[in-house]
Amino acid sequence: MTELINSEPTLFLFPNKEDSKQLVEKAIEVFSNIKIPSTSPIQTIVTKGLDNWQIYNQLALAAKYALDDLPQVDVENEDEEEDSITSFQDEDDETSHQELSDNSEMNNRDDADDEFLGFSGPENLEDVDESSAEDVSGDEAEIMNEEGQQIEQKKDAFGLNDGFFDIDNFNKQTLALEEEAVEEGVLGDEDDGIDLLMDPDENMEDSEDESNGPQADSIMYEDFFGPKTAAGRRELKKKKAESKRKRTSKPDFKNDVQQNVIEENNESSDNEYATFDRVKKDLFASDEEDDVSADQLSSYERDKARLTQQIRELEAENVAKKSWTMMGEATSKGRPSNSLLDVDLEFETGAKPVPVQTEETTETLEDLIKNRIISKTFDDVPKRAPVAVTEFRPSELFELNENKSQRSLAEEYEEEFLKKSNADTYKSEADKKKEKEHEEIKALFSEVSRTLDSLASWHYVPPPPESTVEIVSNAPTLAMEDVQPTAASDTMALAPQEVYKPSNENREGETITRSGIAISSTEMDHQQKQARRRRVRRKHAEKRKQMAEKRRNSGTEQVVRQLSKSNVEVIGKGGERKKVASNSNKYHPIVSSNQLKL
């Protein structure tokens, strides 16, 4: 074990899953034999879906309530009172003081650690079933007292011991190494023997052990199971003081030599505890407990300490309760009463601010009134009555037409031009509408007058004659195209197509346009030729279409021709009567010269 500690001490710094599993199973077995009080929040241990550490926390919490519920037991053994937790019942053995000191120190360490975990103590020892204890291997399993009685050590209740590791042997070897270090002066009894600012690499170079890991004498219980609580340390010190007081008041030793030896052992154990506390403070001390002066620190350490202090201040400010002004929108319930009276607020409002009525503004207004009265300056606005009431004229009302105008822009310009050119005779739409209304009024009035006359007379009153305007024109009825000079002949009035009519013989190479003018193909340009070809193709297409339609309607045409010969009349959709006529009997008018366009 010592070789393993010196070679690879870091193996004990990491938890072993198998050992932790055995520890939890053994603890559950012990928990099943203990009666848990009703005040405990945990009555059953839940293991499904939880790891060993969570199960261990449940067991520790349940054991705490179970230990508090047990009665106190007085132990007369002074070594049990001194060490606070032990498995010995009689310590009057006549073994050697050195062996007794080693065993007591070893038990002190084990029991103090178990008490810190919450699974040991005088109360818990009574509840643990003897069947749940395991045999401890090694020569340290049994110790003989003065009367030769064999006392069994505390059982391994947590399953830490296996074929390779034994917690008792480990504690003994650790204490032995610590004693050797104390004797050699490595660990002194005074605090001055430890230099807090020393370089730890210096001792590592001088050490015979060439391993890079931590030394065996520096490995503590806290390296495996975490630091002890302050309550556990205070309870341990209290029990130590009580044991010392009882030891001084109870002269139960056989001789002074034995008493001196035991006192020396107690002092050595106290010194060892003090040494352990100093080493623990050196390892786990915080920045607040560092008493090193600022002169002995380097510039980097001073900057680091200053930065740490700033971080602590900022963290404290962040965690502390903030004022209501720093908590966002605060209502009346979220701030103290009358807290707005001492605060200047800036807020936006949509209304016009009311002027503040101060003493200065009041005095200024009073002085202004007094000065006006003294100078008799009464420049108020004089009252005046309206001269005349404006006359309402409906004709001046403007009627806006919301509908879109139906007239074109040319008609608008035409109307505007007529209005400017003939201002006297021009009549707008409003004037025309007004005249129409006047005519309607006159017609209604004449009808009313005639009705009144017929009622007042004894005879029939005929309707008044209506005045009709007829325009008689004395001018000769001559059309413009018929007016010709008397000396001119009819030949001069003919159109070109009437003068020249190409016959079928001399029509080759000539084309008659729509206007009737003949043009030669040599005189035609490319566009005119394309237009002629399109016209010819269109003419042939229409002819073919007519022939196809004629063939389709040959039966219908025959029936219609038969009906037309018989002078049959047919009533149409509008109720009119018409004779049936075939397409062959339709009238084709003859085009004369008067119907041709120039």
Swiss-Prot record:
It is found in: Nucleus, Nucleolus. Residues 76-151, 183-274, 284-303, 499-598 are annotated as: Disordered. InterPro entries: Mpp10. The keyword Amino-acid biosynthesis does not apply. Keywords: Nucleus, Phosphoprotein, Ribonucleoprotein, Ribosome biogenesis, rRNA processing. Residues 544-554 have a biased composition (Basic and acidic residues). The modification Phosphoserine is found at S268, S269, S286, S293. GO terms for cellular component: cytosol; Mpp10 complex; nucleolus; nucleus; small nuclear ribonucleoprotein complex; small-subunit processome; sno(s)RNA-containing ribonucleoprotein complex. Coiled coil: none annotated. Residues 76-94, 124-145, 183-211 have a biased composition (Acidic residues). One of its GO terms (biological process) is maturation of SSU-rRNA. Component of a heterotrimeric complex containing imp3, imp4 and mpp10. Belongs to the MPP10 family. PANTHER family: U3 SMALL NUCLEOLAR RIBONUCLEOPROTEIN PROTEIN MPP10. This is U3 small nucleolar ribonucleoprotein protein mpp10. The gene is mpp10.
